[in-house]
Amino acid sequence: MNSRTLEIRRAALSAGLLALVLLVVAGIYLGWSRGFREEPQPAWVFESAESRFKYGSIGAEHDAGVPYWIFYVLPRVFPEKFRQDGKVAPGGYAALGVAWEQGQELPVGFTRKTIGFARVANNCAACHTTSYRTSPDSNPVFVVGGPGHTVNIENFFRLLIDCARDPRFNADILMAEIDRVTDLDIIDRLLYRFVIIPITKKRLLEREAQFAWIYRSDFPDWGRGRDDGMNLTRYFMIRAPMDDAFGPADIPAVWNLGKYHAETGQLPNYAGDTHDVHSVMVDSALGVLGAAPANKADFLAQVKWLQDYLSNLPPPKYPFPIDAARAAAGKPVFDAHCAACHASPRTGTRLPLAEVGTDKGRLDTWNKDAAIKANRIVAGMGIDRRGLVEEDLPGYKIPFLDGIWLRGPYLHNGSVPTLRDLLEPAADRPKAFWRGYDVFDPVKVGFVTEGEGAKQVGTRMDTTQRGSGNQGHEFGTTLGRADKEALVEYLKTL
């Protein structure tokens, strides 16, 4: 073999190796670009603090995100799964009772972010945004930081699993529907068909075992505006075995969190089960992520921003006229019958169950052992926080009453529809009512819970069911009618 031929072969080999290297590099880049490349959200999301709270990512797209185009077409492929039986409420995701601003592609609390491909996840606003209307014909007002009394969280959890279990959740059917609404390029089409759809189905079905308890026939539905938060922590964070504990609670308001002062014994959460607001923010955000954060520094920065924002977020002002004279008459009634708990050093501390007498289901879902395990898991992530209180829970926290007019239904489990009903003995309170309707009742102070409108969108609250008892807190029940009405008028001012 002459030197010329050898040089040609060497050149060809070098060119071939170079081409192979370039091909490998291109493949790696393509895989990174289409699978992992993270893009910032659009600038409009961050134009205001409120917009960021509503639509800003907290990092949940990494592990809990649903591919955007799958999320988009699920209501088209499975329309029957998005409807409540016998209801004429809107279909699609609106049927879940989410707050949805006109002109937005996604509901409040649903975030869109590209990590290789566009994904949809949730943030805190999905549960902590209140919708109210001043009349059936008026447009909704959305109040960030308020309790999401209309949202049906349990149905959302079930919905994703139920869709994944359906034989129609396959590449042929989903891709046919995706093709009707968008024009993916060839690479994305192949990724969706052979990678994204199969993996999404697999991961949703993997959640089924962890969510088995929400399918139990002996557990009542949570209904709109409630969740079983401590059981979610037990089954997802510490992977506890399923037991019979059941304690649904109203989604709380999270405005004005700066009012809590841990050094004086004021504890957040319904049962005072967490040492301070920072710990609540960390644990709640971890719950939304569903896994350890992909980027711990970014996660903690998001938590700090949320805590600062919510600590300084004021409660909403009452939107209807207030009878000033009646409210003034209600102030001494409040001072005599309510202030010792709700406007004193006791506020934010625990009241023993024997003293308040309310439903104990929420207390039964948490204990010292669970707190120790949860604290150990978070510490293992390298996250520093004071954490959950490592003791059994003796009672419920005495709540602050800021913005109390918009926090119905009342008691920790939402078993009393209005403030006026709360001033009646337990035996005289409504035994059942519709919850999740957003038309406000300015007379009784709460939401309208009866009538055709409430029936068509609401879920039925039956206070004889487990975890939903309306007993207890029989304070002010012996007041005269005039004093009760004056007290309710005063509470509108808080």
Regions found by a protein language model. Give the residues of each.
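N-terminal Lys/Arg-rich, disordered targeting/topogenic segments
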Residues: M1-I8
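Periplasmic c-type cytochrome electron-transfer domains
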Residues: R9-L18, L23-L494
